[in-house]
Amino acid sequence: MQPTSNATVYIVDDDAIVRDALAWLLRSRHLPSQVFASGEAFDQFLDEGFVPNEPCCLLLDVRMPGMSGLALFEALIARGLAAVMPVIFLTGHADVPTAVEAVKQGAFDFCEKPFSDNALVDRIELAIAASARLLAAQRHHAHVQTLLAELTDRERDVMRLVLEGLPNKLIADQLQISV
């Protein structure tokens, strides 16, 4: 899978060695990244007006001092960002109930450290592709809403009857339009 050039992988991990290794791995695969040392730092980044206009994903350590990865994930859900920013949890302490709960809440994946570089990059690329699809759907929806808002009342009446499945002749009769 070809990475999306304008995509960003956000890395939140309290371990500087892990952050640096992940950033290096992603750079070697031509995937831009941005690193954060804590859940609070990433939460502040979001508070400063982050708007996901480009595909992205989040590599998120589960256990961190202060704001845990799970607490940050809940904050993403509350902000409505979890879908457009797929979350791949990283953990050195596999905990099946935690993994199951995170996936039930919408996490994209749950990877145990140490992980295979290739497998992780494959998951990241799939997450970015999912983000890109959702952002494209959101843009399309916004475009359709704009077009609908520009319709005249008469055009809306015609559209409503077309959507009800009426043939042109019946629409013309109902709206008293000559054919």
Predicted segments, located by residue:
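Two-component/phosphorelay signaling modules centered on CheY-like receiver
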Residues: 2, 7, 15-36
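Acidic, metal-coordinating helix/loop segments flanking the phosphotransfer/catalytic sites
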Residues: 35-57
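Acidic catalytic/metal-coordinating carboxylates
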Residues: 37-38, 68-74
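Active-site residues of response regulator receiver
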Residues: 60-61, 91
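Receiver (REC) domain active-site loop signature in two-component systems and cognate sites
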Residues: 64
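C-terminal output helix
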Residues: 95-97, 111-124, 170
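Helix-turn-helix DNA-binding segment
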Residues: 142-179
